[in-house]
């Protein structure tokens, strides 16, 4: 059995506990960890909140097994329910558990140490491995399939949208050319291809393939679509006083989280409206001033924390019916920026 306590360092653990635990003080409180991983954060939440129980969601069956074992070792298994699911099944998971409202929801959107360190997953550009990149190995789409089957236009789209890659067209063109004679099946092959395409003078810090690997991982796992679809579900299941705490690791995730939270932090009325109706008042309270970042000491101890952005809000009143309807319908909340409206 893998020793999860040594391979996994939870990012900003103290900050996360300080944000989550106050919402779990009452007997019967329920927390949901949407990205359970190896349960580093979740074990800390339960230890700090003896009156609470926790539902842990993960699409990675190996991580679920290790997390469950860890809970047993920590004596927390009686307050822990593991669920194999993607977090965009949030509402269904709660329904299956007979739960409607929850008091705290946590999301750590980074890769777990298990996924990074087990080279056969193909997540890391530092090791030569099959191009898999599935967080849930029961799902069909792999990174190898994306590279083999996507059109030039679709490859450009994902590298540009999900990797913010400046040389998307050049990389996609070389992939399409090369795959006609040599299938791209390993991370080493992809590394070498990107290394040949991206000019030395225009390389970001670190491995030049970093953005391409990020884009492929997001595409294979549908990460941004799942995040955008999950946040409204979470809001509709938060109890008043409940908290949503999210750690993101790249700008696309952070922008999505920020845009969603901002909906409930602002007055939803035109700036020239003389009297604002109650249902247009904010329903979230910001718990972090902007985003919390890792300090130099944490980065030195855990380099994976360097890019983290931690945001949190508390639900201060029931969500207005029209916002609940938008959330239920899966509205494109990112487009609902209320320009010219009250802050």
Curated annotation (Swiss-Prot):
Pfam families (UniProt xref): Methyltransf_5 (PF01795)
Give the UniProt entry's GO cellular component terms: cytoplasm
Keyword entries, A-Z: Cytoplasm, Methyltransferase, rRNA processing, S-adenosyl-L-methionine, Transferase
Which residues does S-adenosyl-L-methionine bind?
39-41, 58, 87, 108, 115
Tell me the GO molecular function terms. Answer: rRNA (cytosine-N4-)-methyltransferase activity
Please verify whether the record's keywords include rRNA processing: yes
Q: Which reaction does it catalyse?
A: cytidine(1402) in 16S rRNA + S-adenosyl-L-methionine = N(4)-methylcytidine(1402) in 16S rRNA + S-adenosyl-L-homocysteine + H(+)
Q: Tell me which Gene Ontology terms the entry assigns under biological process.
A: rRNA base methylation
Q: What is its EC number?
A: 2.1.1.199
Localisation: Cytoplasm
Q: Which domain of life is it from?
A: Bacteria
Please report which protein family the annotation says this sequence is part of.
Belongs to the methyltransferase superfamily. RsmH family.
Briefly, what is this protein's role? Specifically methylates the N4 position of cytidine in position 1402 (C1402) of 16S rRNA.
Q: Which PANTHER family match?
A: 12S RRNA N4-METHYLCYTIDINE METHYLTRANSFERASE, S-ADENOSYL-METHYLTRANSFERASE MRAW
Q: Which named protein is this?
A: Ribosomal RNA small subunit methyltransferase H
What is the protein's species of origin? Bifidobacterium adolescentis (strain ATCC 15703 / DSM 20083 / NCTC 11814 / E194a)
Lineage start: Bacteria, Bacillati, Actinomycetota, Actinomycetes, Bifidobacteriales
